[in-house]
C-alpha cells in the first residue's frame, strides 16, 4: 500500500470544511476565468447538470438544488428518453441542456453548465467524470469515488489536466451535527477520544439492482454505506487509518448476495492511538449510529448518517444540538462557493482515492484473515 498523506495536510483540509476559510492565495489559478466574483452571489448561480436520473437525483438532488443559494439545475444526462421528457417539463430544462451518455462531450459548448454531478453506478464514475472534465466542467462525484484506485487516479488526473475541481459527495462533512461532533473532539471537552464506533446499514430490496452487482458496485454495503463509517472515523481521528481489519459474516441469503458481501464488521487503527470499530450491512434496517468514547465520557449521533433527523447526545447531559439542514443543498453550495472564490474543496478526489484504498484493504483483510497495513 502507498503511504498516506501527512496529518498536517489532513487537518488543513478538515479545517477548510469546518470553517469555509479562503486560503491566502489561489491554489488553482486556471479555474478563475469562468466565475470570479470577490463575494459569493455577485454573479449568476452556477449551473449544475445531473448525470443519472435515478432515485437519488429524483428525490434528493433535484429538490435540493431548488433550495441552494449558489446553484441551479441547468442540465441533465440520461439514457432514458421518457425521463428526459419528464424532467424537461418539471424543471424547464431546455433541449440544448439535455444529453445522453454518448453526447456528454457536447457540454463543452454549453456555458449554462458549470458543474457536472455524477450520480451513476460506482463503476461508471470514471467514465462520466472524464467526459465532464474534457468538456471543461467541474465535477462533483457521488461516493464511493470509483471501484479501484487506478480509476480514481485517472479521474484526478483528467480533472487536474482540465484545470477544474473534483469533489466527492461526502455530505456529512458539512452536516452541522457532524461538525459539532468534530468541535467537541477537537476541543477535548470530554478529554482525548480513544475509541470510535460507527454503524450504518439497511435491508436492501430488489435483488436485481446494480448495488448487488460487483462489476457495477465494486462491493456491497461497505462501498455503499459503510463508507460513511470510514469517513466519520477519519473525521474525528483527524487522520487516515494506518491499518485495517475486516470480517464478512456468513451470508443469510447466499443467492441474493452471491456477488457481494451481505455485511461487514471492521476495525480501523490510527497512528495517534485511536481505533474505530464499525459495522455495515444490507441485512437489517435501523442500523444508524456513531459514538466517540473519550477519557471523561462519550458523545454521539443517533441517527447519525440519514438524510434527515440527525440527533446528537452527550453522556454528561450537555446538549449536542445543531440546525437541521438539507444536507445535499449544503454540500452543493459549499462546492459552488469553492469554485466561485477559487478555493480548493475540502473533499477533493485525493480523499476519495484514499477511502477507496482503505476499502480495498478491508476486502483484502476479510479475504485473507489478516490485518492490512496502509502505511
What residue ranges belong to the model's regions?
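N-terminal secretory signal peptides and thylakoid transit peptides that target proteins
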Residues: 1-18
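C-terminal helical cap and adjacent loop that interface with cofactors, partners, or active-site loops
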Residues: 13-17, 318-375
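N-terminal Rossmann-like dinucleotide-binding module
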Residues: 14-92
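Predominantly a Rossmann-like dinucleotide-binding segment in NAD(P)-dependent oxidoreductases
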Residues: 56-57, 165, 172-257, 369
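Short acidic-hydrophobic, aromatic-tinged amphipathic segments that line or gate anion-handling sites
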Residues: 97-102
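Beta-strand-loop-alpha-helix segment that lines the small-molecule cofactor/substrate pocket
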Residues: 114-115, 121-122, 126-173, 188
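NAD(P)-dinucleotide binding in Rossmann-like oxidoreductases
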Residues: 250, 254-261, 269-332, 348
Amino acid at each position: 500500500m502507498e503511504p498516506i498523506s501527512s496529518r498536517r495536510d489532513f487537518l488543513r483540509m478538515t479545517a477548510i470544511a469546518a470553517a469555509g476559510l479562503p486560503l491566502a492565495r489561489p491554489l488553482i489559478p486556471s479555474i478563475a476565468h469562468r466565475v470570479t466574483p470577490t463575494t459569493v452571489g455577485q454573479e449568476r448561480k452556477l449551473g449544475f447538470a445531473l448525470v443519472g436520473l435515478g432515485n437519488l437525483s429524483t428525490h434528493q438532488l433535484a429538490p435540493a438544488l431548488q433550495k441552494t443559494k449558489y446553484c441551479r439545475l441547468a442540465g441533465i444526462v440520461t439514457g432514458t428518453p421518457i425521463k428526459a421528457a419528464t424532467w424537461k417539463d418539471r424543471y424547464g430544462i431546455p433541449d440544448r441542456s439535455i444529453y445522453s451518455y454518448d453526447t456528454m462531450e457536447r457540454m463543452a459548448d454549453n456555458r449554462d453548465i458549470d458543474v457536472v454531478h455524477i450520480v451513476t453506478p460506482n463503476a461508471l464514475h470514471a467514465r462520466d467524470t472524464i467526459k465532464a472534465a474534457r468538456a471543461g466542467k467541474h465535477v462533483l462525484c457521488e461516493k464511493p469515488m470509483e471501484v479501484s484506485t487506478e480509476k480514481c487516479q485517472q479521474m484526478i488526473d483528467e480533472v487536474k489536466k482540465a484545470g477544474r475541481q473534483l469533489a466527492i459527495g461526502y455530505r456529512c462533512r458539512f452536516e452541522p451535527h457532524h461538525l459539532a461532533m468534530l468541535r467537541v473532539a477537537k476541543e477535548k471537552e470530554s478529554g482525548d477520544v480513544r475509541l470510535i464506533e460507527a454503524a450504518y446499514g439497511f435491508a436492501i430490496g430488489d435483488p436485481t439492482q446494480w448495488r448487488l452487482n460487483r462489476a457495477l458496485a465494486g462491493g456491497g454495503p461497505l462501498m455503499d454505506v459503510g463508507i460513511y463509517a470510514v469517513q466519520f472515523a477519519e473525521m474525528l481521528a483527524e487522520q487516515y487509518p494506518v491499518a485495517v481489519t475486516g470480517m464478512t459474516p456468513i451470508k443469510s441469503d447466499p443467492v441474493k448476495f452471491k456477488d457481494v458481501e451481505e455485511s461487514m464488521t471492521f476495525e480501523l487503527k490510527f497512528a495517534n492511538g485511536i481505533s474505530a470499530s464499525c459495522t455495515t450491512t444490507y441485512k437489517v434496517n435501523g442500523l444508524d449510529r456513531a459514538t466517540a468514547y473519550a477519557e471523561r465520557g462519550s458523545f454521539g449521533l443517533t441517527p447519525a448518517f440519514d438524510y434527515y433527523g440527525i440527533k446528537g447526545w452527550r453522556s454528561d447531559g450537555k446538549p449536542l444540538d445543531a440546525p437541521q439542514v438539507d444536507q445535499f443543498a449544503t454540500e452543493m453550495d459549499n462546492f459552488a462557493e469553492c469554485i466561485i472564490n477559487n478555493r480548493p474543496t475540502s473533499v477533493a478526489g485525493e480523499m476519495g482515492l484514499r477511502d477507496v484504498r482503505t476499502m480495498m484493504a478491508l476486502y483484502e483483510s476479510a479475504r485473507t484473515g489478516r490485518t492490512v497495513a496502509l502505511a
